[in-house]
UniProtKB/Swiss-Prot annotation:
Superkingdom of the source species: Eukaryota
Ranges occupied by Kelch repeats: 123-165, 178-229, 257-305
Domain F-box, first and last residues per copy: 13-61
Database matches in PANTHER family: F-BOX/KELCH-REPEAT PROTEIN SKIP4 (PTHR24414), GALACTOSE OXIDASE_KELCH REPEAT SUPERFAMILY PROTEIN (PTHR24414:SF184)
Entry annotated with the keyword Iron: no
Organism: Arabidopsis thaliana
Name the UniProt record assigns to this protein: Putative F-box/kelch-repeat protein At3g10510
A Pfam family assignment: F-box
InterPro entries named in the record: F-box-like_dom_sf (IPR036047), F-box/kelch-repeat_ARATH (IPR050354), F-box_dom (IPR001810), Kelch-typ_b-propeller (IPR015915)
Cystine bridges: none
Swiss-Prot/TrEMBL keywords: Kelch repeat, Repeat
Stored Gene3D superfamilies: Kelch-type beta propeller (2.120.10.80)
Length: 371
């Protein structure tokens, strides 16, 4: 242990002597976000800088933004739902050290189940759902009307105005700076509207929308869960077209969710354990070939796109039980690159496939936030 005299003689760290402007403009924006926690250990100066909104503005101007994957894991044994972040595969977390890939965000509080989770910029809005895990009391108690906002830059939360009515089993969509949420109150379906500019609620509907079970069981691109590259809400029109196709809609109970990448819709078919595609220009369905390395038996799935890569989360149930908390479940994550070959077929390559967690797990949500 250093004496007081020795402490005074100890020269300051080279890093802490660097001006803030140099750190903010030249160093920190280029450091991958998964290394920010290590960077913040250097000094209090760095801790304040990596949490600064200015850093993320600079990252955007320099083209150094990243697509960060957030996964909500519901633990049926502990009866808690918590957010995790998925780190990119690096040399430090190659096979054998996958626990470094899925990181619990300890600063965020437990989350509700069956809620609406909506990405807007660097924020995640959490609306409605259930905080009580006692299913037997759900018929007697209405869903929560609490709404909060998660700032993904600092991993902090703040409350926003309560919903006019508590909803659960929600789907949602951001249109014209408003969040439209369709959910159930008891057995009936209701649509509510949240204005992002004023952060106030109002009863409202969108032309052509109907508050019925079709929307509650529709694909999540309609709900705004998956990143979309379609312009002018074409993804919404695409989903309407698909939902009107009676031949295809009969299969939707087998699809958990989907995402759009490169104007192609990708959805995991948990009945046949294959990754399906939908081409809106050709109006045809297809199958991604070359994915034999995926673990079989994905009983639940979530798929998102990060850059030019698909991230597929699979829950594999090894031992079945009516109560999920007594099931032996594994959470797998596969990173898949895809390419369209000359004959028009889409082929995929499994870049990595890791077992992340085990236990009585359910994937509550999976979102991509650009930071």
């Amino acid at each position: 242990m250093l004496s007081e005299d020795e402490k005074e003689k100890t020269p300051p760290s080279v890093m802490t002597s660097i001006p803030d402007d140099v750190i903010m403009e030249c160093i920190a924006p280029r450091v991958p976000r998964y290394n920010h926690s290590m960077l913040s250990l250097v000094s209090k100066q760095f801790r304040s800088l990596v949490a600064s909104p200015r850093l993320y503005k600079t990252r955007s101007l320099l083209g150094c933004t990243e697509d960060c994957v957030y996964v909500l894991i519901e633990d049926c044994i502990l009866e808690v739902a918590r957010w995790y972040s998925l780190n990119r595969r690096t040399k430090r977390n190659m096979p054998g050290t996958v626990e470094n890939r899925l990181v619990l965000i300890s600063s965020l509080p437990p989350m509700p189940t069956a809620a609406s989770y909506v990405v807007v910029g660097s924020n995640i809005f959490v609306m409605g759902g259930r905080y009580d895990w006692n299913v037997e009391e759900w018929e007697a108690q209405p869903p929560s009307s609490i709404a909060l906002c998660i700032d993904c830059r600092t991993h902090t939360t703040r409350l926003v105005a309560d919903m006019p009515v508590g909803l659960m089993t929600n789907v949602s969509k951001v249109i014209d700076e408003k969040i439209y949420i369709v959910g159930r109150v008891w057995a009936s379906a209701t649509i509510v509207e949240f204005d992002l500019r004023t952060e106030k609620w109002a009863d409202g509907t969108k032309p052509g929308w109907e508050a019925d079970d079709r929307w509650l069981t529709s694909l999540s691109t309609t709900a705004g869960r998956g990143p979309s590259s379609f312009e002018n809400n074409c993804d919404h029109k695409l989903m309407e077209d698909i939902l009107m196709d009676k031949e295809e809609i009969k299969h939707y109970h087998l699809f958990d969710n989907e995402c759009v990448m490169g104007n192609i819709l990708y959805v995991y078919d948990r009945h046949k354990y294959i990754l399906r595609t939908y081409d809106p220009k050709q109006r045809t369905w297809g199958v991604v070939k070359g994915l034999e390395k995926l673990p079989l038996g994905g009983d639940e799935s979530y798929i998102v796109s990060r850059g030019k890569m698909l991230i597929l989360f699979l829950i594999v149930v090894l031992e079945y039980d009516d109560d999920a908390s007594f099931q032996k479940r594994e959470l797998w994550c596969a990173e898949i690159t895809v390419e369209r070959r000359e004959e028009g077929e889409i082929w995929g390559k499994v870049e990595c496939c890791d077992l992340l967690l085990e236990g009585g797990l359910i994937i509550g949500s999976c979102l991509v936030v650009t930071l």
